Curated annotation (Swiss-Prot):
Keyword line: 4Fe-4S, Iron, Iron-sulfur, Isoprene biosynthesis, Metal-binding, Oxidoreductase
The name this protein goes by in its record: 4-hydroxy-3-methylbut-2-en-1-yl diphosphate synthase (flavodoxin)
Organism: Hydrogenobaculum sp. (strain Y04AAS1)
Top EC category: oxidoreductase
Function: Converts 2C-methyl-D-erythritol 2,4-cyclodiphosphate (ME-2,4cPP) into 1-hydroxy-2-methyl-2-(E)-butenyl 4-diphosphate.
Gene this chain is encoded by: ispG
Lineage summary: Bacteria, Pseudomonadati, Aquificota, Aquificia, Aquificales
InterPro entries linked: Dihydropteroate_synth-like_sf (IPR011005), IspG_bac (IPR016425), IspG_bac-typ (IPR004588), NO2/SO3_Rdtase_4Fe4S_sf (IPR045854)
Length: 354
């Protein structure tokens, strides 16, 4: 079992982060925030996918003004993403945002950062303090020669100390880079020196297989070491996909349970059925079910039940049908035409029993 890093508890709206609380899955809308209808529609889809906190871009006044309606509507906390125009932070807080994300490295004056922090403190609004290689302070670049892991961690520690010197502790830190190893090292250095909660992710991970693999490895390294209080999988894809992948990463490490865990074999020359099609049918039928159960779908009967003994229910396929099993014991043989429906019925019964 993974022992998570002990961090202080902070509050984002009604959501508790850090401490002994579960890891929070976040994502970000890809709509123009001032398009309230489109933004709310995407928020609905994200919530349905299991997203627990949602960030929206606020580059202009019309976006900040739209937050009033969006915050009122959303069932989960809304975080305003602020870059380069610090005035938007004040407008977003006034509009009711539960949290704001700022990157002090792209705010010209420390006094402005101070004013934002003091306003957040007054309103009890959570702040995400962002540090990345593209906005590292000049003196740190001169000291280290490039945006090294040490430079990123030092920047985050310096700004954290500044926030705390103002008596403000309701913040988390994100240290992000597109390089997996640098990203991991920077977060590890920071985590060793403070109890501030960490938001983790790999920025600019990419799309498709590349993005998923990069995020899975980068997040997996940190999560295995107990680091991470909130996470986002950044993909060039629909935001709902980010949430899906985030849950799969957490489930694979035993850090979160959501939905059914379907395992299937990679197939070989012994296969007698269209296994990918069977798996897709089962996934589609169960995608909206909030059940905590492991299902195995194996391509043949050779060692299938033994290999999948850890599963609660499953199929060991063979020519013309499959063996349906539960808790490692064969229940019956089913035909190829009925094996998916029989499996789904068994899953439903299993869930009622537990």
């Amino acid at each position: 079992m993974i022992k998570r890093r002990k961090t202080r508890e902070i509050t984002l709206g009604t959501l508790k982060i850090g401490g002994n609380n579960p890891i929070v899955v976040q994502s970000m809308t890809s709509t123009k925030t001032h398009d309230i209808e489109a933004t709310i529609s995407q928020i609905d889809r994200l919530i349905k996918a299991g997203c627990e906190a949602i960030r929206v871009a606020v580059p202009a006044k019309e976006d900040a003004e739209a937050l009033k309606e969006i915050v009122k509507y959303s069932e989960v906390p809304i975080i305003a993403d602020i870059h380069f125009v610090p005035y938007m932070a004040f407008l977003s807080m006034e509009a009711g945002a539960h949290g704001i994300r700022i990157n002090p490295g792209n705010i010209n004056k420390k006094e402005i950062v101070r004013d934002i922090v003091l306003e957040a403190k007054k309103r009890n609004i959570c702040v995400r303090l962002g540090v990345n290689s593209g906005s590292l302070e000049k003196h740190l670049l001169e000291k280290y020669g490039y945006p090294s892991a040490e430079a990123l961690a030092e920047s985050a520690l310096n700004w954290s100390e500044f926030f705390e010197s103002l008596g403000f502790y309701n913040f988390k830190v994100s240290i992000k880079g597109s390089d997996v190893i640098q990203n991991a090292l920077a977060n590890e250095i920071f985590a060793e020196k403070t109890d501030t909660p960490l938001h983790i992710g790999i920025t600019e991970a990419g799309m498709g297989t590349q993005g998923i693999v990069k995020s899975s490895v980068g997040l997996g390294i940190l999560l295995y070491k107990g680091i991470g209080d909130t996470i986002r999988v950044s993909l060039t894809d629909e935001p709902e996909k980010e949430v899906e992948v985030a849950y799969e990463i957490l489930k694979s490490l035993g850090l979160k349970k959501k939905g059914i865990d379907i395992v299937s074999c990679p197939t070989c020359g012994r296969i007698e059925v269209n296994l990918p099609n069977v798996v897709k049918q089962v996934q589609e039928a169960l995608k909206d079910k909030d059940l905590s159960i492991k299902v195995a779908i194996m391509g043949c009967a050779v060692n299938a039940i033994g290999e999948a003994s850890h599963a609660d229910v499953g199929l060991a396929c063979m020519k013309g049908g499959a063996l349906l099993f539960k808790n490692g014991k064969i229940l019956k043989k089913v035909t190829e035409e009925n094996m998916v429906s029989e499996l789904l019925e068994t899953i439903e019964k299993y869930y009622q029993e537990v």
